[in-house]
Amino acid sequence: RKLKEREEKTGQKMPKAVLLFTVCLHHFLGCDLERIYRELEQRFPEIRFLRCYMDPIMQKHGPTPDQKLRKAMYEPLNPDRNKMDTKQISILGSDFALDLSCDLKELLAIAGYKVRELQDCSTWEEYEELGNAGTFLCCYPSGKYGIETLAERLRRAFLYLPLSFDYEEIRSEEETLWNSLGVEGKQILSEWMEKKIALCEEALNHAKQIIGNAPITIDYTFHPRPLGLARLLLIHGFNVKTVFLDSISPEEKEVFEWLKVNAPKLELRATVHAKMRVLHEAHPSEKTLAIGQKAAWSTGSHYFVNLVQGASLQGFDGIRRTAELMEEAFLNEKDPKTMIVRKGWGCTSCI
C-alpha cells in the first residue's frame, strides 16, 4: 500500500527489487514467511522480493545472515543463455569494487576479458548484465557461498581467489586464473608477477623506514586475513604487538600455527569482550599504528588505516597499497571518535 501511495504522490516508480529483512522476532512468533512472500509476489508481480535475514540466533549453524544476504542479492539474475559472454567475468560477493590497478583487473585486461562488478551498476538493466558472464569470480570469504550457488544455478564457471597477504598463495591463485582463461605465455605471467613482488618489497621496505619500531595493532575488520597481514609484517621487521579478532578463520589456521612458533609474544584479543568498550580510554604511551577501525578504537590511537573488509585491495598490488596506506596513516593524525562512528552508506527505504 505504501509503495503505491508513494508512486501516486511523487511519481516515483516502483522499485525493481526490494530486500526484505526478517528478524529474530519473526522466528520466535512462528510467522509463516513463505505465505508472506507469496502474498507480496501476487500483489506486486513486477517487484522481486529478495529473502534477507537479520537473525543472529541462527548463527550457530548454517550460513550466517551476511552470507545469506550476499546470496539473495544475486537471486534475480536469470539471463538469456543466448547472451552469455564467455569473454566477460563478473567479480561479485564484496561490498567494494576492486582497484583498477589490482592484479585481477590488470591480468584480465591483458587477456582481453571484460570485467563487471555490482558497484558499477546504476540501472536494473546493468545489474542484469552481471548474469551474462561466462565466469563468476569471488575474492571475499563471506561472498563465496552466494556466488558459488549462483554459478551452480546458472551453470557457469566459478573461481574463488581469496584475498591474501602471502606471496606464494597469490602466485598460485593468479596461475589458476591464467590457466582458466586459456591464455598462452606462462613466462609472461611469471615475469609480470616477479615485477609485482619487487614493487611490494620496495613499498614494505619504505614503510619500515618511516614507521620504524613503532608498535602496530591489527583487527579483523580491516581484512579477512588479519593473521596473514601480521605474518607478512613480522617477516619484514615490523613491530606487530596485537591482533584483535574473535575467531580464527579456517583459511588462516596454517598462519596461526606459524605465529605460535615464530611470534609467541603476539597478543590475540577478542573484540566481543565486555571490557573492550572502555579499553580505548587507556591511551597508548607511545605512538601506535592501528590497522583497522577496531584496532584504532581499542588502542585509542590517532594514527590508523581507516579501511574495512579489504576494500579494493587485491593481489600483489593489494600488498603494495597496504604498505602505502600504513605509511600515510602513520604520518597523518586522525580523530577516531569523529570518523569511526560513521557507519553505513545509507539506503533508500521502500516505505
Regions found by a protein language model. Name each.
Residues 1-351:
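An N-terminal assembly and electron-transfer interface module characteristic of large anaerobic redox
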